[in-house]
Design a protein with these regions (language model features):
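Extended, alpha-helix-rich binding/interface surfaces that flank or overlap catalytic cores
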Residues: 1-92
Length: 92
């Protein structure tokens, strides 16, 4: 499934992608570590609403994901993906 970039926050180094097919959203982040590894997770319906209606609270969620992406809270929600340029990712 392919997701198109709909939002970028350069200060926090994350993007939100959306599937035109399903409406599902993905949070993507480039980590500020050696070689800038990339991680992504699917957003729940509540998190998607937070992104749309309460951007300040969503920013806190994104920052927490970036800082704690290996924690049990997020590790089971992470997805494997391939980047297709800067505007598209494909979940594999």
């Amino acid at each position: 499934m392919t997701f198109r970039r709909i939002h970028t926050d350069q200060s926090a180094w994350f993007c939100v992608f959306r599937s035109d097919q399903t409406g599902e959203h993905v949070l993507y982040a480039a980590l500020r570590e050696k070689d800038f590894p990339e991680v992504a997770m699917r957003l729940t319906a509540d998190e998607t609403t937070l992104f749309r209606d309460r951007p300040t609270d969503f920013l806190a969620l994104a920052r927490d994901f970036i800082a704690s992406h290996d924690s049990p809270v997020y590790s089971s929600r992470k997805i494997t993906f391939r980047s297709h340029g800067v505007d598209l990712i494909e979940v594999v």
